[in-house]
A protein has these predicted regions:
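Phosphate-binding/switch region of NTP-binding enzymes
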Residues: 35-37, 62, 181-239
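The Walker A/P-loop phosphate-binding site
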Residues: 2-98
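Amphipathic alpha-helical transducer elements in NTP-driven molecular machines
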Residues: 28-31, 85, 135-142, 178-182, ...
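Acidic, glycine-rich A-domain
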Residues: 126-127, 175-176, 224
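Conserved inter-motif catalytic segment of the P-loop NTP-binding fold
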Residues: 71-172
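Hydrophobic, well-ordered secondary-structure scaffolds
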Residues: 136, 154-206
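Active-site proximal loops enriched in glycine and acidic residues that flank catalytic Cys/His/Asp
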Residues: 50-52, 62-63, 79-82, 128, ...
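Conserved catalytic network of the ASCE P-loop NTPase/AAA+ motor domain
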Residues: 39-41, 69-71, 117-119, 147-152, ...
Length: 239
């Protein structure tokens, strides 16, 4: 039976830190407009959804860049929605320099590529399948994030873009699958002090009859419905 009583003596130091910090354990996300509404939990999760082209990927990466620049956090990226390894690295370079990749007078140069290598390779680890023919599940990625360590230390965050690109062993109702897998994720984040950020696309978003614009999606619009809301106790962001 997979049950145990948690011994306070094993948790004493963690709880004392929890008390001193007011129970927060969160970092400023880097957006003044979100201050007091959204913070980056070191042992939490963030799920991002939004209409097509609303900037979900850009928003997520901006948060991660700020966490690296200010707090020194490291991130594992699994992002087929961005594209190939080269396309992901290009996006990281553009964010690092805040300049165009090429084609303009002030575009990133060959020397810039070299100068940024150490920083990007330290804080952003681009992940891919070891065997393209084999499935990769979200649990595989979360477990790998918790187990990975190199000369620069552990990885603090797993960024998935997007949920649809992973293998999901549903075998029945999708909401029941999500209840299981998201509960696993939440417990793992707290246990291992990691942050799991996921981009999940809505199934479809109708146009508002009055504004003639797409309605802002919520958790019910993602495949699996309200399980996303109940499965994300820390942070849910929609655009």
């Amino acid at each position: 039976m997979n049950v145990k009583i948690i011994d306070y003596n094993a948790k004493r130091k963690d709880f004392e830190v929890f008390h001193k910090t007011g129970g927060a354990g969160m970092n400023y996300a880097g957006f003044e407009c979100l201050n007091g509404v959204f913070q980056f939990a070191l042992d939490g999760v963030t799920d991002i959804t939004g209409t097509p082209g609303s900037g979900k990927t850009e928003f997520g990466l901006e948060i991660l860049f700020y966490q690296s620049e200010v707090f020194g956090l490291r991130h594992l990226l699994y992002a087929p929605d961005i594209g190939s390894y080269n396309e992901i690295r290009r996006k990281l370079l553009v964010k690092y320099y805040r300049r165009s990749f090429r084609g303009y007078e002030n575009s990133i140069t060959d020397l810039d590529l070299i100068n940024a290598t150490a920083w990007i390779d330290t804080y952003f680890l681009i992940a891919g399948k070891e065997d393209a023919k084999k499935p990769l599940s979200p649990i595989d990625l979360w477990n790998f994030t918790c187990e990975y360590e190199d000369k620069n230390g552990i990885v603090n965050t797993c960024f998935i873009d997007s949920w649809k690109n992973l293998y999901h062993d549903i075998q029945g109702r999708e909401d029941q699958y999500l209840d299981y897998v998201l509960s696993y994720r939440n417990e793992l984040a707290e246990l291992k002090q990691r942050h799991f950020m996921t981009i999940a696309h809505p199934k479809n978003v109708e146009f508002d009859k009055d504004t003639k614009k797409r309605r802002i999606p919520d958790a019910n619009d993602i495949s699996g419905g309200a399980s996303w809301m109940t499965g994300s106790p820390r942070s849910s962001v929609r655009q």
